[in-house]
Each structure stands twice: as structure tokens, then as C-alpha cells.
Amino acid sequence: MAPSGLKEVVGEKILNGVIRSVKKDGEWKVLIMDHPSMRILSSCCKMSDILAEGITIVEDINKRREPIPSLEAIYLLSPTEKSVQALIADFRGTPTFTYKAAHIFFTDTCPEPLFTELSRSRLAKVVKTLKEIHLAFLPYEAQVFSLDAPHSTYNLYCPFRVGERARQIEALAQQIATLCATLQEYPAIRYRKGPEVTAQLANAVLAKLNAFKADNPSLGEGPEKTRSQLLIVDRGADPVSPLLHELTFQAMAYDLLNIEQDTYRYETTGLSEAREKAVLLDEDDDLWVELRHMHIADVSKKVTELLKTFCESKRLTTDKANIKDLSHILKKMPQYQKELNKYSTHLHLADDCMKHFKGSVEKLCGVEQDLAMGSDTEGEKIKDAMKLIVPVLLDAAVPAYDKIRVLLLYILLRNGVSEENLAKLIQHANVQAHSSLIRNLEQLGGTVTNPGGPGTSSRLERRERLEPTYQLSRWTPVIKDVMEDAVEDRLDRKLWPFVSDPAPTSSSQAAVSARFGHWHKNKAGVEMRAGPRLIIYVMGGVAMSEMRAAYEVTRATDGKWEVLIGSSHILTPTRFLDDLKTLDQKLEDIALP
């Protein structure tokens, strides 16, 4: 079976390209990693998968470890000064080294000075393998990637970091190129015209990809691959999406609940005394995958239906499938504890979201949607937006960040307000402590103060959508329009120029694809997708509604296209505002993530 998504592609690359490539029957090895490589591995492989491949122990290179001189070690490391020094130190020992021999795999290109240092050390005598596997990104979901570089927004957009910008662009470009190479893609590269940084990053990615292509001329070959594209877009193209209260399950939960490192914590009651449970929300949970993009209004209904079907399939009758009922079902069917716990978790999560929604969020959603759309539920243009926002700004019960979200949406709708008006709005809302955060939207290309009254907006033109929506979920992320135009080959070439000429599309492709279908095998024997991919990189963080759009557009093409989206990091609205807050600060004044 072909890998179904990014996590599987990366997992296969680590298992085949690293661990199995040095595996010998009946021989155990130690796996040593640093923090970045551990994050990559844990995002796509289970510990049991690793141990099943003849690995006896997995260790952190930066922690004190017991020497095991009888075993060989596999090192999977990022090529940094700290990790290379720790690696050299493992083979400095007398009378014995920490391990018998070293198989070294760097996640990316090792800088020349570090390489020289390695070759001059005692380690050089016992190195059996030394490879660069070019895997400098995290597969966050099947169609979502992260470069795990949340600080890059600050480096790219803060005026005090202009000197860092070129270096940051080079680093991001290298990471994006490793993503394309891992997927066997050599896409045509396009960028949103306007901001300098999008063109700079697009050109830098092309240079890095050309270097990969020189090493591996077959990169990007195969039926239909010539249609693959990489789009570089900046957060300023759509500052609205990360500000809205989204009502689809994943985005809503991450916005309203305290979910850290994808872990949802909640109190369980019923079976005995209350206790805290921690549940990882990831793609190993098929129920989460089924529910995460659903509107909250449909989630509880769906879980209840699925639970009922499950109980009926096990010949158990239930009256009301609610949480209290679940503990009663569990007593009757203890053997299905794992499955029932899953239903219980998602009922809890949905319930938790609804409690917050009914509390204060519901009244904000209508205002936010009207401001984002510029029209009300009837499609009538908003004539007096000030009337909409004043009750929210004056309401002491609304938290500061929620007021700021509404304020920024108002400013974006008006395409800037006068200095005097801005001061009044900030005072009404009582968010004086955050006035620089609001002004920092300008660093992303938004207009905050506009002395001559409302100016002309540089927003991208929107598609008209006629499909029915929930009244509080009328907004569609701009990026979804862009994805649809790209896969239909309707993206405006003036607004989205190519940095390299697109490959000519010829009728011969159809014949080839009929021969190969959408999959072909690469050298390692792993099936790779042969249909075209649209890869989108958003500078400044990607919102969860935009992640959802990638799946929706893929589905709408019946799998002819696969849309991937990613960024330096994943945004929640709070995270987006926290990022904005730093954009006028000096490095020594902030704690970067």
C-alpha cells in the first residue's frame, strides 16, 4: 500500500533509510537522538515500531548515558554544533568508547567546519555510516507539515531583525526543499506578488531544490509530476482567518481549551472518584480524524450515533448514549474499555467546547463573521460596523484578547482607521496595554492607521460561494480560494508569478498516467504518489481552518490532486496575537518560543 500521507512517508524514510539500512539479524543497536530529531521521529513513529527493528534503547544525546561498549549506535541528529560536540565526546573516552561503532545520520546538510571537526576526531576510526537524510520538517498531520521554527515570524517581520532576515529565509528554504525532496517533488514555484519576503523565499527554495536535483536527477520525474506546484504565501494575504472563533471541532478546541502539545486534559467522573485524564489528539485516533473538521453542531450527534452503532454491533442496548450512560455500559462491557474511552473523550471534548461557546463566545461569533464578510447573514452590506463592535468593546466580561480580535477585524474591514479613532477604540475596549500589538498588524502588511480615511485594500479577490453554511461559519479562508484556483489552473500569473517557468503541460501526460495510475515505486521500494501535489507554505504560521481547507480541496478533486499545507508553526488565535505582540520588541525584551 502506498503511504497515506506525510507521517507515513516520513516514518518509512526513517525506518528504511536509517534503521533498516544498518540492521543486521540478531544484532541489537542503540538509537541516540537530539531534541529536533526526537520531535521528527515521535511525530511519525511509535516507540514499539523502533524497538521491533532491533533497537534496544533510545537515548537523548544531551543526557548522561551509561556506556554500552559492546553495542553499535545509530545517531540520528540535527547537524548543530551542540549535537556534533556531544557525538565527538562519546568517542573521546579511555580506555573504551561509549559504543562499539557509530552509524551517523544527519537530518540535513552538515556544515563544512563541523564535518572537518568530525573527521579529525577519534570518532572517525569507528564510523561505519555517515549520511545526510534531508528531513528537516515535522509531519504534523497527513497533509500538514511544520518547520518547527516559531521564532521565524519574529525574524522575518520585526524591524529590529532586518539583519537576520536573509539568514532566516535561507534556513526556511532549506527546510522546505527537504520536504519536496522527501516527497520526490520538483515543483514549479510561485509566490504571492507584493511583499518582498515571498519572492525572496521562493527564489531561495528554487536554489536549494536545484542543488537536490543536481544530486538526484530523477527528482520530480514521473507521470503528472510536472504539474506539481509550490506556492509561497504570506500571513498578510489573510490576517482574518487566524482571528476568528472557528466552530469546527479541531480549531474550536485548540482555540477555547487549554490543549498543549496536542494533549487534552479533563476530569473523568462516574466509575469511581474523579481523576484527570490526558489524551493525545492525533491521527492514531481514527475517531478524531473523522470528527476534527466537522462543525461542532454535528460532532456530539455524530459521536452519539457512532456509539449507538458500536453498542448495537456488540448486541448491547442503550437508551441514551451520554457520558453517564457510558460508565454504565463500561461495567457491562469491560473488554471494550479502549473503544468506549475514545467515545467518552470526544463527547467530553465537544461538551467542553459547547460550555465555552454558550458562555461568551456565541455572541462574539456573529459580530466576527459580519466583520470578516463585510455583510450580514442576509448578505446585506454592513453599513455601521462601529455599532456592531461597541457592545463587545464595552463589555467587561469579554477577555482582552477577544476584544482585540474584534478590534483587528474591524480595522481590517475598514482598511485602517484614523489615529484618533484608534486611540478611542483602544480606550473603550480598555486594552491600552496591548496597543502596540494592534499596531503591529502593519508589520504583516495590514493597514492599521489610515489618515485619509478608508483606503483601497490589497486583499485578494474572493470566490462567490453558494453552498449553504452555518450562520456563524460563513467565512472561508482566502487560502481555500487560492488552492481551488491552483488545482484548476486558474491562478492569476500576474498576482502569483513563477520563479521558474512551469513545465509545459502536454497531452502525453494523460497517456503516461493511464499507464502508471497515481502511484509508482521509488528506489527503496516504497510506493510514492505519482499524481500532482499542491504544496502551500504560509509565512508566519498556518491557521487550523486553512489546514482543513487542504483536506477539503483534495477531497473535491477525488484524489487527483493532493494538497499539502504548512508553515513555521501551527497557529491558534492566541498564538497569532502573541506573535504580533513581539513584532516591535527588541530580542532581549522577549521570550521567544
Swiss-Prot record:
It comes from the Eukaryota. InterPro entries: Sec-1-like_dom1, Sec-1-like_dom3a, Sec1-like, Sec1-like_dom2, Sec1-like_sf. One of its GO terms (cellular component) is azurophil granule. Coiled coil: none annotated. Gene3D superfamilies: 1.25.40.60, 3.40.50.1910, 3.40.50.2060, Syntaxin Binding Protein 1, Chain A, domain 2. Binds syntaxins 1A, 2, 3 but not 4. Involved in the protein trafficking from the Golgi apparatus to the plasma membrane. Belongs to the STXBP/unc-18/SEC1 family. PANTHER family: VESICLE PROTEIN SORTING-ASSOCIATED. This is Syntaxin-binding protein 2.
